[in-house]
């Protein structure tokens, strides 16, 4: 038997935590002698911190010594499938070989397994001195027959990932690309000793590997390396480019878009357009850049996006994969919670879970929160939101209320066009992972007319932190003011509320001058950003008659219900404005806005009548 202190050292937790687990009966075999807990030597650490009894080990759960950790941040295929819990996606290889497109582009949002899948393709196809078939012998692809196994280890491979090419200047960006090419050429130093390469080719190879090649020479580096590999191995290589659009996003945001587009156009053209030294090509990214902007004339490019049926189950986790994972870790009882938070994406016709969030959720003791929000910031989003119209602002509010919005989705987005046409925001939000398409119809021009909605609770939280923060910072409503409004509502302090709204109006002159609707949009977004966790927010706008009511229905009975009746009219005196606010307050009672809350058993209901005229505001409460 061991003491709590000894077990704490073994489990890397505090003695107090072990003592608490013993008290709650979560450690099997623990006994209390003379005021201290004693624990069996072989007692395993409980995995789920919220399981409340000693029978926490599920029937199908493997013993602790056999449980593999989850691959958080692991994009190395060999390591992932050897050392970690690996969700088998090798049938992607079969689907590809059944169709054999010459060049494939996969577009998915960040953290959906793109890099891991591309490294899997590299390991599968690449010629190696080692026996790499062992990394696939127990995988699904190996059971598909010799016609697929015969491709394993038979091709030279060029592999580049641009996922970390994130710099503020073009000079720094091209230096990083030069370094990546130096590393990739370094993986193929056998070419320097090849009797099938000319001295001229070896001289060029040396310039790349010594990082002395200029920008023009770098543009032909993929094409020339593919030719050298094909000559040496008598087999055209496979070229894999992961996260191809990361430096393009940076170029757009940091004002070197022309330089990066010019470079990439030549770089990819040499590699993929009419290259007889290419067996197959793969690219991944977030956005599908219009072909005329970077893949000009590349007629052999097959694009697979979230709208397509092909490959729909290979990026992200399917429902059956998630159920198997939950069972493996003994937390099948968390299925509904996990589904509510991280399910809801639709890739083609397949329902998909966010893989990054799922593995973080399980590894963090099944604690539901927005894990994906911290994985990167899409600066393009800020650029689009900066020119968002009132209509788009209102639709974002509707989305946050759980409604569906009809939008045109154009997958052929050119970065530079985003700011010119704010309606493209929906296309961007979809491919970036912020929306799903429950319903879609293909149009004659190749775009889709879709019903879009927020996939799950995590993305609702992401909207508030990433998207709504833009409005909180750029004219709709300041975060400080939004906090004051929320606090004054909770406290039923009409004077403080009047002051906060007045401050908001003073600080958002241009936004407010766009019309009264703009004021309400900003106010509603601010309320949602700060109060949606505690309240379901419903609104009823009567266009044309100058009124707008808002009901904040508490999600838990311990919070008061809140009803706002807002009215506006031009050119009112202070006396008239006060009368108008009292009329608004009176209307709440006359129209029985509180009936729904009372029926739900909410006894404390705060009511506010708010009137404004120009830059003046008056608030009254019961």
Q: What are these model-predicted stretches?
A:
Residues 1-17:
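Polyanion-binding surface elements
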Residues 41-62:
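A short, Lys/Arg-enriched interface patch at domain edges and termini
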Residues 63-129, 133-144, 396, 504:
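Walker A/P-loop-proximal flanking segment of P-loop NTPase domains
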Residues 71-74, 165, 172, 176-219, ...:
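Conserved P-loop NTPase mechanochemical-coupling segment
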Residues 78, 88, 123-190:
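P-loop NTPase motor core
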Residues 185, 221-230, 259-279, 593-596:
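Substrate-engagement module of ASCE P-loop NTPases
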Residues 293-296, 304-362, 395:
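Amphipathic alpha-helical segments of the small helical/lid subdomains adjacent to P-loop NTPase cores
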Residues 301, 353-592, 620-622:
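Extended alpha-helical interface modules used as scaffolds for assembling large macromolecular complexes
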């Amino acid at each position: 038997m061991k003491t709590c202190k000894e077990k704490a050292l073994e489990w890397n937790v505090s003695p107090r935590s072990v003592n608490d687990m013993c008290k709650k009966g979560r450690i099997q075999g623990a006994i209390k002698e003379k005021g201290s807990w004693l624990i069996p030597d072989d007692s395993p650490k409980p995995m789920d911190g919220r399981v409340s009894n000693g029978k926490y080990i599920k029937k199908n759960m493997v013993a602790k010594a056999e449980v593999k950790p989850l691959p958080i941040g692991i994009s190395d295929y060999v390591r992932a499938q050897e050392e970690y819990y690996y969700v088998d996606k090798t049938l992607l290889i079969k689907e590809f070989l059944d169709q054999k497109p010459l060049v494939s582009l996969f577009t998915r949002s960040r953290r959906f397994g793109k890099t891991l899948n591309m490294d899997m393709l590299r390991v599968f196809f690449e010629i190696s001195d080692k026996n790499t078939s062992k990394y696939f012998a127990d995988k699904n692809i190996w059971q598909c027959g010799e016609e697929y196994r015969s491709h394993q280890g038979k091709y030279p491979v060029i592999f580049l990932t641009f996922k970390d090419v994130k710099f503020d200047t073009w000079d720094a960006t091209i230096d990083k690309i030069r370094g990546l090419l130096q590393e990739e050429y370094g993986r193929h130093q056998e070419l320097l000793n090849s009797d099938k390469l000319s001295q001229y080719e070896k001289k060029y190879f040396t310039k790349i590997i010594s990082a002395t090649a200029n920008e023009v020479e770098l543009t032909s580096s993929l094409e020339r390396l593919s030719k050298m590999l094909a000559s040496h191995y008598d087999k055209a290589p496979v070229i894999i480019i992961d996260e191809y659009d990361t430096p393009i996003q940076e170029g757009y945001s940091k004002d070197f878009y022309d330089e990066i587009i010019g470079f990439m156009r030549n770089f990819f053209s040499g590699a993929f357009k009419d290259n007889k030294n290419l067996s197959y090509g793969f690219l991944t990214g977030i956005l599908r850049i219009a072909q005329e902007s970077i893949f000009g004339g590349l007629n052999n490019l097959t694009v697979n996006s979230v709208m397509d049926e092909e490959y729909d189950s290979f990026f992200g986790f399917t429902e059956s994969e998630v159920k198997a994972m939950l069972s493996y870790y003994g937390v099948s009882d968390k299925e509904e919670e996990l589904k509510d938070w991280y399910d809801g994406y639709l890739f083609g016709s397949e329902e998909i879970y966010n893989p990054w969030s799922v593995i973080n959720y399980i590894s963090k003791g099944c604690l539901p929160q927005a894990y994906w929000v911290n994985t990167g910031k899409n600066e393009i989003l800020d650029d689009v939101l900066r020119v968002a119209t009132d209509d788009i602002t209102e639709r974002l509010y509707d989305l946050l209320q759980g409604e569906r919005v009809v939008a045109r989705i154009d997958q052929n987005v050119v970065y530079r066009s985003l700011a010119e046409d704010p309606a493209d925001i929906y296309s961007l939000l979809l491919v970036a992972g912020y929306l799903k398409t429950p319903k879609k119809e293909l149009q004659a021009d190749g775009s889709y007319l879709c019903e879009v909605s927020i996939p799950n609770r995590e993305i609702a939280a992401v909207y508030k932190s990433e998207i709504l923060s833009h409005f909180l910072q750029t004219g709709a409503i300041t975060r400080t003011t939004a906090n004051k409004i929320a606090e004054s509502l909770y406290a039923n302090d009409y004077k403080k509320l009047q002051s906060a709204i007045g401050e908001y109006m003073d600080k958002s002159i241009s936004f407010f001058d766009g019309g009264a609707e703009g004021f309400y949009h900003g106010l509603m977004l601010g309320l949602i950003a700060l109060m949606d966790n505690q309240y379901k927010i419903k609104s009823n706008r009567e266009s044309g008659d100058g009124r707008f009511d808002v009901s904040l229905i508490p999600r838990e009975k311990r919070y008061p219900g809140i009803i706002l009746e807002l009215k506006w009219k031009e050119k009112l005196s202070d006396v008239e404005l006060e009368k108008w606010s009292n009329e608004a307050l009176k209307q709440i009672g006359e129209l029985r806005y509180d009936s729904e809350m009372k029926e739900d058993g909410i006894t404390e209901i705060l009511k506010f009548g708010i009137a404004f005229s120009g830059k003046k505001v008056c608030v009254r409460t019961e």
